[in-house]
């Protein structure tokens, strides 16, 4: 009686890719066009062992796309959607598990607060920082 053959090895970084997709879906970003760009940016950074702060988002987009400005803009739009979603969770219940887990790790606190205030009709919205978001997402993807 032989044992079942070992499952084939997973492609490199597939665990991290799944984790990133999961986080983006929790942030309400999975359906956005730019979410795939964010995943590509993260995988490229993981492969290089670098952060977005070290490389720069514009430089990384230029290496990955024939149209880097469009790639960066799609990612920023998806990120704005994520900031809006996390702020909505915070307005509803600031003890929400996803809000407490992701808000401070992926977005500057003052920007989340500004977006929450905006949702309540008190001032302009927050501005998400793609570099900060990518760096935080890399850490989260490697954690679990």
What do these predicted regions represent?
Residues 2-75, 83, 92, 123-127, ...:
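C-terminal output/effector regions of signal-responsive regulators
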Residues 50, 80-87, 117:
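Charged/polar positions within long, soluble alpha-helices
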Residues 87, 91-144:
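Charge-biased C-terminal accessory regions appended to nucleic-acid-, cytoskeletal NTPase
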């Amino acid at each position: 009686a032989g044992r079942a053959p070992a499952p084939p090895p997973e492609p490199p970084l597939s665990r991290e890719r799944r984790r990133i997709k999961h986080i983006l879906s929790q942030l309400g970003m999975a359906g956005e066009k730019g979410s795939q760009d964010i995943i590509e940016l993260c995988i490229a950074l993981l492969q290089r062992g670098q952060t977005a702060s070290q490389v720069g988002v514009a430089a990384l987009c230029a290496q990955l796309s024939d149209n880097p400005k469009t790639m960066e803009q799609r990612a920023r739009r998806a990120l704005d959607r994520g900031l809006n979603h996390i702020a909505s969770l915070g307005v509803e219940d600031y003890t929400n598990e996803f809000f407490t887990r992701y808000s401070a790790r992926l977005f500057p606190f003052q920007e989340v607060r500004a977006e929450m205030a905006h949702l309540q009709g008190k001032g302009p919205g927050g501005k998400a920082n793609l570099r900060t978001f990518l760096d935080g997402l890399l850490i989260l993807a490697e954690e679990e």
